[in-house]
């Protein structure tokens, strides 16, 4: 009798651990977040854009600039690190260091072609995400999320500053 109970508990524990791991790595994809004429503020926990009067945002987009709600850009304690030469799938935990808040001199996610998440092509004047660049965001509640910018253009009308990205909590 005890062996059957032990097996049931082990099976239940295993199922719970599997579901917790799947939940932690659930990936959300956001398409065409419009940052062309205004700053678009985004709350990673709710998965929604929020108004500019809200303090409940983690990351914001303004044309090619990415902001975090910390330091000079906001009242939150959000920080970010830019990982290079990796993939979304390879990032399974937050890095030990490299997290920054925005400052007046420098953004947590560097700006300018080749410095941060994108490259500018002078021949056709396009903006393209650099493969292998992953943002890791530490929210003000202490949660970590990885984020990959997939596109800077609206796929239906090719308008610029319409971000598509995917993210998941670590």
What are the roles of these predicted feature ranges?
Residues 8, 66-68, 144, 156:
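A broad, structure-centric signal for solvent-exposed, well-ordered loop/edge residues
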Residues 137-170:
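Compact beta-sheet-dominated globular domain cores
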Residues 1-26:
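Bacterial Sec-dependent N-terminal signal peptides
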Residues 13, 54, 69-73, 156-161:
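Generic alpha-helix signal with a bias toward terminal, lower-confidence helices
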Residues 23-135, 167-170:
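N-terminal "domain-start" segment
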């Amino acid at each position: 009798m005890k062996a059957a109970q032990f097996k049931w508990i082990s099976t239940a524990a295993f199922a719970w651990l599997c579901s917790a791991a799947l939940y932690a790595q659930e990936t959300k994809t956001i398409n065409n977040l419009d940052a062309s004429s205004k700053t678009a503020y985004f709350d990673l926990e709710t998965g929604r854009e929020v108004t500019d009067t809200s303090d409940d945002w983690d990351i914001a987009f303004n044309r090619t600039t990415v902001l975090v709600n910390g330091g000079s850009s906001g009242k939150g304690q959000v920080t970010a690190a830019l990982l290079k030469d990796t993939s979304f799938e390879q990032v399974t935990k937050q890095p030990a260091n490299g997290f920054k808040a925005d400052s007046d001199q420098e953004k947590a996610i560097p700006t300018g072609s080749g410095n941060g998440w994108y490259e500018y092509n002078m021949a056709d004047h396009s903006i393209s995400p650099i493969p292998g660049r992953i943002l890791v965001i530490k929210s003000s509640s202490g949660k970590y999320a990885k984020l990959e910018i997939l596109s800077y253009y609206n796929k239906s009308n090719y308008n610029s500053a319409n971000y598509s990205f995917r993210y998941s909590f670590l």
